[in-house]
From Swiss-Prot:
Residues 1-23, 39-60, 234-533 are annotated as: Disordered. It comes from Aspergillus niger (strain ATCC 1015 / CBS 113.46 / FGSC A1144 / LSHB Ac4 / NCTC 3858a / NRRL 328 / USDA 3528.7). It is found in: Nucleus; Cytoplasm. Residues 13-23, 239-258, 492-503, 519-533 have a biased composition (Basic and acidic residues). Signal peptide: none annotated. Component of the velvet transcription factor complex that controls sexual/asexual developmental ratio in response to light, promoting sexual development in the darkness while stimulating asexual sporulation under illumination. The velvet complex hat acts as a global regulator for secondary metabolite gene expression. Increases spore dispersing capacity by impacting conidiophore architecture. The C-terminal PEST domain is a region rich in proline, glutamic acid, serine and threonine residues that is required for the light-dependent regulation of development and secondary metabolism. Belongs to the velvet family. VeA subfamily. Residues 336-372, 380-389 have a biased composition (Polar residues). Gene3D superfamilies: Velvet domain (2.60.40.3960). Residues 439-479 are annotated as: PEST. Residues 311-331 have a biased composition (Pro residues). This is Developmental and secondary metabolism regulator veA.
């Protein structure tokens, strides 16, 4: 079977020219040249979303126009009058199939236009790449896939009568008083076609290339042309075997050093016996070799251990245990400078304030018969008078006198109803005392007898009421509360760390007055001891070493 010979290209493909004679007898030659041919396009379809997903022909077609003037008898000597010629030009583009199709016997079904976008372009006079007129089509799209050509039709609107065609009728002058239809005419000059290009479907579209140099030159001169600086080509053919395996291996190799080269800061530590102590210390961060541990929280009757264990500093000067009264055992540490010990004691103060929801710890003020604990109570969230965890016995009371003072306490204190304190957890802990737990004997910290009320024994030694005591200018009023804890020598008082204006004010106090100035108090406050003489007086020692007394609260 004989093959069909290839179709010969049309005569007006890529470049075409035509000439005409004007009324003045001049020859005008029009020359069109498709400088940038369309190469590919993606079919946009005819659905509802076709206009939104429309892809223009790539690269955008560019057609150059040149106009020459010459003598009718001499075609050799031509003058380029493209910029000097006074006329309007526009180019209209249509879509044609590259292969002509035979007409069927039946009537063809009506179809909608296949070419969409902006098929009309006006002339733009540019200096580059050469001085000429250019028609640019940056927004042309094709709906269906196939092989097509673009056909460009040039139309001219003459402005001067001398440039009209030789056979054109002479226009009659318009009357000024009678309006008439505008008599402007468009003349078809010539047609040029592009080379065939392919329109692909969405699945077969190879992608877009970078913008050509001609598109960049035109865009630099102010024309509307889309510029792409990267290649958007789709990879065709079989997939390489290492396309995805390489990425997986690379990511796998990248994860291995991250996991094994750098040690994990939160890895499981070396197995060691756990301690139930509130402040268990890691052996790697201990302050001395084989520092003895303090008794655990269960031995002191605490219900919850501390959430974050911290290092426990050693006591500055632990008192040696006597035969009559045992004292708590403090951790043994090597001798260090006093400044370093004071720094550790100050840093350890913050470790004594966990969350204030620790019930079950009886207060010595409400339950005088509870078992003594060397730890401070955890009901105060921020107590400035808290010292180190192991506090020595009060120096004002001999240890041998404490057992005998238990019998001097005649009656229990009445329940407390009104407390002037800023911590709400103190009210709950003191209003509802919990019976003390049975303490388990321990070799590390033997229990001590409770500190009972000394109102009967020291009533003669303290005749003045609390209001007549010489107050310290830096003393902080705490309301009707009792603090049985002693101060360590390295503990800074609260007044050294906080200013005078930060003290809470009670009972009509003012920031510029003393804690309990006797001159500014009412007569009822001055004679409180006389009016309330039948109540018990409680004596306690403050953090700065001063002895003070308190009257039991009213029922």
């Amino acid at each position: 079977m004989a093959t069909r010979p290839p179709l010969s290209p049309p005569v007006n493909e890529t470049e075409h020219s035509v000439s005409r004679i004007t009324r003045e007898g001049k020859r005008i030659t029009y020359k069109l040249n498709v400088m940038q041919q369309p190469e590919r396009a993606r079919a946009c379809g005819a659905g509802a979303k076709s206009s939104a997903d429309r892809r223009p022909v790539d690269p955008p077609p560019v057609v150059e126009l040149r106009i020459f003037e010459s003598d009718p008898n001499d075609d050799v000597h031509k003058t380029d009058i493209t910029f000097a010629y006074n006329a309007n030009f526009f180019l209209f583009a249509t879509l044609e199939t590259a292969r002509p199709m035979a007409q069927g016997r039946l009537a063809p079904t009506p179809t909608f236009p296949v070419l969409t976008g902006v098929p009309v372009a006006g002339v733009a006079y540019l200096d580059r790449p050469s001085q000429a007129g250019y028609f640019i089509f940056p927004d042309l799209s094709v709906r269906h896939e196939g092989i097509y050509r673009l056909s460009f039709h040039l139309y001219e609107e003459t402005k001067d009568s001398k440039d009209a065609d030789e056979s054109a009728p002479i226009r009659s002058p318009m009357m000024k008083g009678k309006p008439s239809i505008p008599k402007s005419f468009l003349n078809f000059r010539l047609e040029v076609v592009s080379v065939p290009f392919t329109v692909f479907s969405a699945k077969k579209f190879p992608g877009l290339t970078t913008s050509t140099s001609l598109s960049r030159i035109i865009a630099e001169q102010g024309c509307r042309v889309r510029i792409r600086r990267d290649v958007r080509m789709r990879r065709r053919g079989d997939k390489r075997s290492d396309d995805y395996d390489f990425d997986e291996e690379r990511s796998h190799r990248g994860r291995i050093p991250d996991r094994y080269s750098t040690p994990d800061a939160y890895a499981n530590p070396v197995e060691r016996p756990r301690s139930t102590s509130i402040g268990s210390v890691d052996p790697a961060f201990s302050y001395g070799p084989e520092a003895s541990r303090r008794p655990s929280a269960t031995e002191y009757g605490f219900s919850n251990p501390q959430a974050y264990p911290r290092a426990i500093p050693p006591a500055p000067a632990p008192a040696p245990p006597s035969s009559s009264t045992p004292t708590p055992v403090a951790p043994i540490a090597p001798s260090r400078s006093s400044s370093y010990t004071s720094h550790l004691s100050f840093g350890a103060t913050r470790t004594q304030y966990p969350a204030p929801q620790l019930p079950g710890t009886p207060q010595s003020a409400t339950t005088p018969t509870q078992v003594y604990s060397p730890h401070p109570t955890y009901t105060h969230a921020r107590n400035p008078s808290t010292s180190t965890e192991y506090e020595p016995m009060p120096s004002g009371y001999p240890p041998s006198r404490l057992p005998a003072e238990r019998s001097t306490y005649s009656k229990p204190l009445p329940p407390i109803r009104v407390l002037h304190h800023s911590d709400p957890t103190t009210y709950r802990a003191m209003a509802n005392p919990v019976p003390p737990r049975a303490q388990t004997p321990s070799n590390a910290a033997p229990s001590l007898p409770p500190i009972a009320s000394i109102s009967a024994e020291y009533s003669n030694n303290l005749p003045q009421p609390p209001s007549n005591l010489a107050p310290s200018p830096n003393r902080e009023p705490r309301g009707f509360l009792w603090d049985t804890r002693a101060a360590a020598s390295s503990k800074r008082p609260h007044e050294d760390a906080f200013s005078h204006s930060e003290r809470p004010l009670y009972n009509g106090m003012r920031p510029d007055n003393d804690s309990y100035p006797s001159a500014d108090r009412r007569p009822s406050d001055v004679h409180r001891a006389t009016l309330l003489s039948d109540r018990d007086e409680m004596a306690y020692k403050r953090a700065n070493g001063r002895m003070a007394t308190k009257i039991s609260p009213a029922i």
